[in-house]
């Protein structure tokens, strides 16, 4: 049984596909960047094993640009044990161009929107020193709800997503 079906999260620009063996995600990131996404996973084999052994708790997805079917980002959704329909969202893109960043933002918005519309509470967290992740999620409308010595925890709802700077920049200006 899968955690959530996102097979229909796509538009004419991007498409999310379930992570599968052979996607070779880990090597697309620098070691430093990868450990910001999944600090305890050091190889593709460990990542595959994690998804295979816990399909009801964690799922991975790869974001593709529709035009040329090129992978541009990876995320995983982790079911939080304390709540039935609460998930934690983590990931990143490996493209460094402004266009690839906009595509990743667009894909992230569509995926988070789908999760929220399916009735999931969506949260995330990042290490305090991961300023890029914190600013990105804040730009999407995430709000801090807890801080520890090491991490910042955030949540989002549909209203905050639709009112966010990034959502308005991409969808109201019809970029891409």
Give the positions of each predicted feature.
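Conserved beta-strand-loop-alpha-helix junction that forms the acyl-donor binding cleft
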Residues: 123-135
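A short helix-loop-beta-strand connector motif used in the catalytic cores of GNAT acetyltransferases and
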Residues: 49-64, 73
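Conserved acetyl-CoA-binding loop-helix of GNAT-fold acetyltransferases
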Residues: 99-115, 135, 139
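Short amphipathic alpha-helix that is part of the acyltransferase structural core
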Residues: 2-45
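Conserved catalytic-core motifs of GNAT/GCN5-like acyltransferases
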Residues: 125, 143-157
């Amino acid at each position: 049984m899968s955690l959530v079906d996102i097979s229909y999260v796509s538009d004419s620009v991007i498409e999310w596909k379930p992570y599968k063996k052979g996607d070779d995600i880990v090597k697309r990131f620098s070691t430093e960047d990868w450990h910001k996404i999944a600090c305890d996973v050091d190889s593709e084999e460990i990542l595959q094993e994690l998804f295979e052994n816990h399909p009801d708790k964690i799922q991975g997805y790869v974001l593709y640009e529709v035009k040329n079917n090129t992978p541009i980002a990876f995320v995983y959704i982790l079911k939080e044990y304390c709540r039935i329909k609460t998930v934690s969202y983590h990931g990143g893109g490996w493209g460094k161009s402004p266009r690839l960043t906009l595509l990743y933002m667009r894909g992230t918005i569509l995926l988070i929107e789908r999760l929220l519309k399916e009735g999931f509470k969506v949260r995330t967290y990042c290490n305090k020193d991961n300023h890029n992740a914190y600013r990105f999620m804040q730009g999407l409308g995430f709000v801090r709800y807890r801080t520890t010595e090491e991490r910042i925890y955030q949540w989002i709802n549909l209203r905050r997503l639709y009112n966010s700077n990034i959502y308005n920049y991409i969808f109201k200006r019809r970029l891409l």
